[in-house]
């Protein structure tokens, strides 16, 4: 049975000033954790220090998790769904 996941719609300005749009997906509805997960992921793509607050990262909705998303959440605690402007 799929777990419920919580989707945080996130828009962050990159170092070169373009906007990256991605969703932070987690199994816990915790805004502060979603922001922390966004910062962790941004650091892995060389965008550490990017501004991520409640303004850039907002709760969007809750839904059932597809298996690959559920597996990554179990492994890392979160999943990043790249939307626009992400490497």
Predicted regions and their residues:
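Acidic, low-complexity intrinsically disordered segments
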Residues: 37-87
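Intrinsic disorder/low-complexity detector
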Residues: 1-36, 65
């Amino acid at each position: 049975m799929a777990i419920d996941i919580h989707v945080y719609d996130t828009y962050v300005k990159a170092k070169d000033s373009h906007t990256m749009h991605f969703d932070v997906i987690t199994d816990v509805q915790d805004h502060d954790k979603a922001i922390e997960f966004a910062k962790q992921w941004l650091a892995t793509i060389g965008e550490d220090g990017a501004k991520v607050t409640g303004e850039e990262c907002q709760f969007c909705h809750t839904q059932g998790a597809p298996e690959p998303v559920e597996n990554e959440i179990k492994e890392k605690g979160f999943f990043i769904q790249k939307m626009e402007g992400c490497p």
